[in-house]
Amino acid sequence: MVRESFESVACVFVLTLFSELPGEWILKYKDKLIGNKPILKVRGSEDWFNGRLETKECILLDVTIPRDEFDAEASATVALWENGVQATDTNSIPVKYLHPVYPAHLGTTVVIFMGPLSGKQGIIRSIDSDAEVIVVEILEDQVLEDVQKEYMTLCVADHFG
């Protein structure tokens, strides 16, 4: 009973985090994100695109911002990322369906999109398997900072290299 209760709380936390993470974070940091080709995860609805891309990982290539209020919502051009390989064909996905894939390996390049260091880029220098706070070397300042894991998304450049 206690385990089920804990899992329910953890599930609610994750869902709350994703529901509070608007697609605008991609728009705000699109220049830094596009340049580093971050890996994102599609978290949409089965109603959208018949659910074919749900939970797929992809690389952000470009972002299209609506010109006026009558245009469709902001969308991202992405290439699927499977088994460490970028697909050659692309898909257009509304930014609201894209969420970060959090870093988990030393040396991974990250973009921080929330918190006091938002907009900065860094490299993971220390991480524990259960850590919620990760030590990141901020590239701009070359200083080590503690950053909450859910505040950053990984970038392809160093992830599998």
Q: Where does each model-flagged region fall?
A:
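Basic, amphipathic alpha-helix used for nucleic-acid engagement in HTH/winged-helix/SANT-Myb modules
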Residues: 13-21
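Short, conserved secondary-structure segments in the cores of folded domains
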Residues: 28-30, 100
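Basic/aromatic-rich interaction segments and small domains that mediate binding to polyanionic partners
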Residues: 3, 20-27, 35-90, 106-154
